[in-house]
Design a protein with these regions (language model features):
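N-terminal Rossmann-like NAD(P)+-binding subdomain of aldehyde/semialdehyde dehydrogenases
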Residues: 1-135, 320, 337, 346, ...
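Short, well-ordered beta-strand elements within core beta-sheets of diverse protein domains
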Residues: 17, 29-36, 52-56, 130-131, ...
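Conserved C-terminal structural/oligomerization subdomain of aldehyde/semialdehyde dehydrogenase
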Residues: 25-31, 65, 199-204, 223-226, ...
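Rossmann-like NAD(P) dinucleotide-binding subdomain of oxidoreductase/dehydrogenase enzymes
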Residues: 117-277, 410, 463, 485
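ALDH superfamily catalytic-core signature
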Residues: 195-200, 224-226, 234-390, 413-414, ...
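Catalytic strand-loop segment that frames the active site of acyl-thioester-processing enzymes
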Residues: 526-587, 673
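HotDog/MaoC-like acyl-thioester-processing domains
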Residues: 530-539, 619, 623-676
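Hydrophobic beta-strand-centered segment that forms part of the acyl-chain substrate-binding groove
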Residues: 578-587, 591-636
Length: 676
């Protein structure tokens, strides 16, 4: 299978000499790649000129719907990816992480795009900022898609997940992608991109794939582009030093080496649920993907007195791991990705042995099921023990990217934190303790050095997603050695592909620009109640001003006894004497809300289908018996949901008869479309 690049809407064979890619399992040739023949400047230009405008014309909801259709399409055709992926050394369980996990990430971003983002082409970021005394000059931040290209350089270990977890937020943000898979597993990524291209779901130029060397691609980057890199620290540093990256201030997101730790708490001795969970997670992280995960546990920290028990329990569990042909159902660990990778892992283990003793596993003796241990890149799990981790250096600095972990003891939580932080920046650490005080000490002792912390105990053991699984909802990345970048994290990931801009102007102007009504902007008052308007007919700024209603003592007492809310401030003038907030007996805040609804609601059947919530409720002025209130209701924002209805966000202000603001909130309704 000769691998082509998918650029400018077609598959193009590279120039230059072909080089083979061998199966990690059998050593047989599975694919060929070559370099050269691609005009990288034209590839980037196609993304910027064709893909970018096509994506930016779509709203977040339309892009989200596109991601959902793509995820469904891939999910129905993933079996072929499974077959290919076995050649990389991946078991079926490994493929659940890589292939199903990647498709699942598309589904998550599709859902978040529909639920958490507006049906617009830009984002409003934060609240309105008053910039003048009289309120005629205000500020607001917006985020718009960059007019460049997202260049994604991926690692070999997750050819599907790595591609899709970067693709999803970029496409949702409205930025086209040029993806560059790692060569040794590029045949899996190539098959994935072929499926995406065949689906016809993404617009032309939204995704291009460069197989093989990137050539002079970096020479053509601009300040509107984004580079997202996953791989070794050495390669990341080389790319970040490229003169164009510095000159153009190209946004660079890096995820690099990481010496992740698992920390057994002082309370979690042998026999405890947390001890068993710790052993299970460490062993799993050593063997899933043959330990070739950026989030794998490389350092297993335990109270010094529990180290012998930890080594014994881990050795017993690792001894039961069946190694062999990953296509077999009974095999739990396949080979590393290739013979060169095996040599690299063994060389690094030898370096680690200068500070640590190999306590389980023998690289010269690997029992392999259904495959030739010499032809394939097989390794056994290798467990080391470092007796003096405070004085050691290599165990905190050198990553053997395979089924390798080092156990080390600590004396006290301060020392545990010191050892964890010796990794100089990690993607993740996991804590195994049922003691909240110990967990808090560790979280705040190591948080500055870690991108993610997982606290595991008996209460979450059955449903926890594991130390090494980055969830699309949560940020993935880490400081220092880990690269200083961030990926995923829900809609936070979109911010890498968007430009934040500060807008300043009058409330009227900014309301029109952003489609979000700002207090101080003109209101549109019509004879017809705004609740009688279908979604399409309701204009932003459409307002209703109610009549007044006086709050009586009888109202307050009836509400108190009817609801059971007999808080003293509503019931006793004497009890409120000297109160710092209340001048005397006051009305319930929720009584105000109820009266407000009675003042502004149009009761007859109509376009308003439901009120489904309140946001940002604040009670600003207490009201006493005898005071009157009135309500201003203004359509603030609209967002279509489907062909039948859309969401309307109303700005509501409850005022006193004197015009003082008593309460503010945002009311959410679903309004029907015409003809629905």
């Amino acid at each position: 299978m000769r691998l082509e690049s998918y650029v400018q809407g077609r598959w193009i064979a590279p120039g230059g000499d072909w080089a083979g890619i061998r199966s990690a399992v059998t050593g047989a040739m599975v694919a060929e790649v070559a370099g050269g023949g691609l005009a990288m400047g034209e590839v980037l230009d196609h993304a910027r000129r064709v893909g970018g405008p096509a994506l930016r014309r779509l709203t977040f909801h339309q892009r989200a719907e596109m991601l959902k259709r793509l995820a469904t399409y891939l999910n129905e055709r993933r079996d072929g990816l499974y077959t290919l992926s076995h050649q990389t050394g991946a078991t079926r369980a490994d493929n659940l992480i890589d292939i199903d996990g990647g498709i699942g990430t598309l589904f998550v971003y599709a859902s978040k795009g529909r639920r958490e983002l507006p049906n617009a082409t830009f984002l409003i970021d934060g609240a309105v900022e008053p910039l003048s005394r009289g309120g005629s000059f205000v500020g607001r931040h917006v985020m718009t898609p960059r007019h460049g290209c997202a260049v994604h350089i991926n690692a070999f270990n997750f050819p599907c997940w790595g591609l899709l977890e970067k693709l999803a937020p970029a496409i949702l943000a409205g930025v086209p992608v040029v993806t560059k898979p790692a060569t040794i597993t590029s045949y899996v990524a190539h098959a994935l991109v072929r499926l995406i291209a065949e689906s016809g779901i993404l617009p032309d130029g939204a995704l291009q794939c460069v197989v093989g060397p990137t050539g002079d691609l970096f020479d053509h980057l601009t300040g509107q582009d984004v580079v997202s890199f996953t791989g070794s620290a050495d390669t990341a540093q080389l790319l970040q030093r490229h003169p164009v990256i510095a000159r153009e201030a190209v946004h660079f997101v890096a995820e690099r080496d990481s010496l992740n730790a698992a920390i057994l708490g002082p309370d979690a001795g042998p026999g405890s649920p947390e001890f068993d969970l710790y052993v299970k997670e460490v062993a799993k992280e050593m063997t899933v993907k043959a330990g070739q995960k950026c989030t794998a546990i490389r350092r297993a920290l335990a109270p010094r007195e529990h180290v012998p028990a930890v080594i014994e329990a881990l050795s017993r569990r690792l001894a039961g791991v069946k190694i062999g042909d990953p296509a077999r159902e009974d095999v739990r660990m396949g080979p590393v990705v290739g013979l060169a990778q095996r040599r690299d892992v063994l060389a690094r283990v030898e370096a680690l042995k200068a500070e640590a003793e190999l306590v389980f596993g023998d690289p010269a003796r690997v029992a392999v099921e259904g495959a030739d241990p010499e032809a394939g890149a097989f390794l056994p799990p290798l467990l080391l023990h470092c007796a003096d981790p405070l004085r050691a250096r290599q165990v905190h600095a050198l990553e053997a990217f395979g089924p390798v972990c080092t156990v080390m003891g600590y004396d006290g939580l301060d020392e545990a934190a010191t050892l964890a932080n010796r990794g100089e920046g990690s993607l993740v650490a996991s804590l195994y303790t049922h003691d909240p005080a110990a967990a808090a000490d560790l979280v705040f002792g190591i948080g500055a050095y870690h991108g993610r912390l997982v606290v595991l105990d008996r209460d979450c053991a059955k449903e926890q997603t594991g130390h090494g699984s980055p969830m699309p909802h949560m940020m993935h990345g880490g400081p220092g050695r880990a690269g200083g970048g961030e990926e995923l994290g829900g809609v936070r990931a979109l911010h890498h592909y968007m430009q934040r801009t500060a807008l300043q102007g009058s409330p009227a102007m900014l309301s029109r620009i952003t489609g979000s009504w700002i207090r101080g902007a003109p209101e549109a008052i019509r004879p017809e109640h705004p609740f009688r308007c279908h979604f399409e007919d309701l204009e932003i700024g459409r307002s209703f001003h109610s009549a007044e209603r006086t709050i009586t003592l009888e109202d307050i007492e009836h509400f108190a006894h009817f609801t059971g809310d007999t808080f003293y401030a509503h019931m006793s003038e004497e009890a409120t004497k000297g109160h710092p907030f209340f001048p005397g007996r006051v009305a319930h805040g929720y009584l105000l809300l109820s009266f407000a609804a009675g003042l502004f609601v149009d009761p007859d059947p109509g376009p308003v289908l439901a009120n489904y919530g309140l946001d940002s409720l604040r009670f600003l002025k207490p009201l006493q018996p005898g005071e009157a209130i009135r309500v201003r209701l203004t359509a603030k924002e609209k967002s279509p949901r489907n062909a039948q209805y859309g969401e309307v966000r109303w700005d509501v202000e409850i005022q006193t008869a004197a015009g003082e603001t008593a309460a503010t909130y945002e009311l959410l309704t679903m309004n029907a479309m015409r003809g629905a």
